[in-house]
């Protein structure tokens, strides 16, 4: 197995950056994603919600008052796809739209109280799993993990 082109200050390859170790990490990301998706799909009514809907609701939950273009950018989906998701969620009263106080052409998006409670219920097992893993790992590991994730996401944004 080859090493990726990273060396520590002394010039020798960093063992955790061997290609096989990086591939193992990638496989772990895939497995975690699959497990989280399964937990969510087991808890939702698939006639109403899909993973895209839950992700949309989560982003609005984290950013109350977010506007359409910001949500579209965060989800990295087309205008047409987001319109389809939002139309359904607004029609079923999961999302509340309010006219933006600074620009009447824009609408701020919020979750209803019922939707916030439902989302908390759906995500509770995942949040508990993540919290438990963070507690077992210690603060340095949590900071390192978050730094890795943020570096991956920043690189993706820079490549776009």
Predicted regions and their residues:
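N-terminal leader segment of winged-helix/HTH proteins
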Residues: 1-47, 94, 111
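C-terminal regulatory/oligomerization modules of transcriptional regulators
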Residues: 1-17, 128, 139-160
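Charged, amphipathic alpha-helical coiled-coil/dimerization segments
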Residues: 4-8, 87-144
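N-terminal positioning helix adjacent to the helix-turn-helix/winged-helix DNA-binding module
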Residues: 21, 52-53, 114
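Generic structural concept
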Residues: 26, 30, 57, 112, ...
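Alpha-helical linker/hinge and terminal dimerization helices associated
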Residues: 29-40, 75, 115-137, 152-159
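N-terminal helix-turn-helix DNA-binding core of bacterial DNA-binding proteins
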Residues: 37-78
């Amino acid at each position: 197995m080859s090493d990726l082109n990273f060396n520590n200050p002394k010039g020798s390859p960093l063992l955790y950056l061997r290609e096989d170790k990086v591939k193992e990490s990638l496989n772990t990301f895939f497995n975690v994603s699959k497990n989280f998706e399964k937990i969510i799909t087991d808890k939702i009514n698939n006639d109403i919600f899909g993973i895209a809907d839950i992700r949309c609701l989560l982003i609005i939950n984290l950013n109350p008052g977010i506007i359409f273009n910001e949500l579209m950018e965060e989800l990295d989906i087309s205008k047409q796809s987001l319109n389809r998701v939002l139309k359904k969620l607004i029609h079923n009263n999961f999302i509340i739209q309010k006219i933006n106080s600074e620009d009447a052409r824009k609408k701020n998006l919020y979750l209803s109280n019922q939707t916030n409670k439902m989302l908390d219920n759906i995500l509770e097992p995942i949040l508990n799993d993540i919290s438990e893993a963070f507690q077992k790992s210690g603060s340095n590991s949590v900071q390192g993990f978050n730094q890795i994730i943020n570096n991956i996401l920043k690189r993706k944004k820079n490549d776009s």
